[in-house]
């Protein structure tokens, strides 16, 4: 059942779609493929699914000429911040911050750039 207000999907801008797909696949285990309709090549767009069925539709990595200067950030749950930030840098991303802790009611998180320069964060939820 789709819930009112639930995120339907996300689109990640990329100047190199295949590089971005490889980054997210190698770092987070997301599964990528060319669009099912066969009319758009994988170098221009790839759809993906992420663990946990976080949105009912697929996510999309789409080719752009230039990454927008600002936009939405998404926070990705991970089991281990240290191991994941190491995977981010190993796979071509960039660590932007140390771990940020805002108190007991906010999970620790850390910002990074993907291979395309998009800013996102990883977070961990101990005990969940």
UniProtKB/Swiss-Prot annotation:
Domain of life: Eukaryota
Disulphide bonds in the chain: none
The UniProt record lists the keyword Heme: no
InterPro entries the UniProt entry points to: Anthracycline_SecMetBiosynth, Glyas_Bleomycin-R_OHBP_Dase, Glyoxy/Ble-like_N, VOC
Keywords: Virulence
Pathway participation: Mycotoxin biosynthesis
Domain named VOC: residues: 6-125
Gene3D superfamilies to which the protein is assigned, alphabetical: 2,3-Dihydroxybiphenyl 1,2-Dioxygenase, domain 1
Family annotation (Pfam families): Ble-like_N
PANTHER family according to UniProt: GLYOXALASE-RELATED
Function: Glyoxylase-like domain-containing protein; part of the gene cluster that mediates the biosynthesis of the selective antifungal agent ascochitine, an o-quinone methide that plays a possible protective role against other microbial competitors in nature and is considered to be important for pathogenicity of legume-associated Didymella species. The pathway probably begins with the synthesis of a keto-aldehyde intermediate by the ascochitine non-reducing polyketide synthase pksAC from successive condensations of 4 malonyl-CoA units, presumably with a simple acetyl-CoA starter unit.
Name under which the protein is recorded: Glyoxylase-like domain-containing protein
Native species: Didymella fabae (Leaf and pod spot disease fungus)
């Amino acid at each position: 059942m789709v819930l009112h207000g639930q995120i339907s999907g996300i689109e990640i801008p990329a100047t190199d779609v295949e590089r971005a797909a490889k980054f997210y696949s190698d770092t987070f285990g997301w599964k990528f493929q060319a669009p099912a309709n066969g009319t758009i090549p994988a170098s221009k767009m790839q759809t993906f699914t992420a663990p946990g069925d976080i949105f009912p539709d697929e996510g999309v990595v789409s080719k752009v000429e230039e990454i927008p200067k600002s936009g939405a950030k998404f926070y990705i749950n991970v089991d281990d911040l240290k191991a994941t930030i190491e995977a981010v840098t190993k796979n071509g991303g960039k660590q932007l911050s140390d771990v940020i802790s805002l108190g007991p009611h906010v999970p620790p998180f850390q910002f990074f750039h993907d291979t395309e320069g998009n800013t996102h964060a990883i977070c961990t939820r101990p005990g969940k």
